[in-house]
Amino acid sequence: MPTMWPLWLLASLLALSQALPFEQKGFWDFTLDDGLPMLNDEEASGADTTSGIPDLDSLTPTFSAMCPFGCHCHLRVVQCSDLGLKAVPKEISPDTTLLDLQNNEISELRKDDFKGLQHLYALVLVNNKISKIHEKAFSPLRKLQKLYISKNHLVEIPPNLPSSLVELRIHDNRIRKVPKGVFSGLRNMNCIEMGGNPLENSGFQPGAFDGLKLNYLRISEAKLTGIPKDLPETLNELHLDHNKIQAIELEDLLRYSKLYRLGLGHNQIRMIENGSLSFLPTLRELHLDNNKLSRVPAGLPDLKLLQVVYLHTNNITKVGVNDFCPVGFGVKRAYYNGISLFNNPVPYWEVQPATFRCVTDRLAIQFGNYKK
């Protein structure tokens, strides 16, 4: 029998999620299990911690007699998870701010399923069997900011998403195409998680992300063979790990000059063209682990804010004295606090100590035994 989360905890987590909207913990930690921690500082995540935050008074206890059978209702939170529901329940209080319907058997969202829920802030539909959504199903949800609809059977991104939406998590579905206009009017959106879908590069129509000002985008565990070139240029975080990307060409990153974090681990990257990384002047963290690189990528010393580089589990055989640090002092604005090189065929005893002259501490350098 699944453990039921206390309702006071759900309400608390809803309130806490405002400070760091992209870092999932506890109840919100549904799916991100690849081991890459989210940026946890406001500047790095690009998160706006003031806009869209509901008044804390809205979480004042209410005593509405409306509560669906079998559900738990308190503090404007309606929890109906793990009940084997076949449809969205009726008799949901109109002042509900969080509706939890995860881990059920819901296969369809109908036109009036959310009628009257104009105060709903977060809707959790993770791990159902949803394959059909009426084009007006979300119309009543004028204040919805968080929609979690991952681990369902969707073959397309739902139409007519609420214009108030800030965060969409739709990973682990069956989506193959992202058509132009599907995100039209979503000016408040800053986070989309759509990994775990069978998306190829050809599945993104030109202009698919037009109008979006995203800070965070994850398209991991898909079928990408290259870095998409038409993503929002406002991105601070881009995660494309666990794909089939083979190379980074000169202009692949041209649009993404505002990136703080770039995740490209677990791909098939053999080549990074010289100058490719020069378009990322604000980059702080770079994940290139579990690829097929034979050398340290060129251009790392020119990234003045870069602090973390994951290069473990590649085919790197040599590390040069100037591969990480610029020549001379005072050029780099932030020292490295993490460089991983373990599981590479590098004779670590041949690496000169001066190679890591711009690292905060020797413990930040991770070498390890290489096993062929």
Curated annotation (Swiss-Prot):
InterPro entries: Leu-rich_rpt, Leu-rich_rpt_typical-subtyp, LRR_dom_sf, LRRNT, SLRP, SLRP_I_decor/aspor/byglycan. Glycans are attached at residues 45, 51, 274, 315. Residues 1-19 form the signal peptide. LRR repeats lie at residues 86-106, 107-130, 131-154, 155-175, 176-199, 200-224, 225-245, 246-269, 270-293, 294-316, 317-346, 347-372. Disulfide bonds join 67-73, 71-80, 325-358. Residues 20-40 form a propeptide. PROSITE patterns: LRR. Keywords: Disulfide bond, Extracellular matrix, Glycoprotein, Leucine-rich repeat, Proteoglycan, Repeat, Secreted, Signal. GO terms for cellular component: extracellular space. It is found in: Secreted, Extracellular space, Extracellular matrix. The two attached glycosaminoglycan chains can be either chondroitin sulfate or dermatan sulfate. Belongs to the small leucine-rich proteoglycan (SLRP) family. SLRP class I subfamily. Homodimer. Forms a ternary complex with MFAP2 and ELN. May be involved in collagen fiber assembly. This is Biglycan. It comes from Equus caballus (Horse).
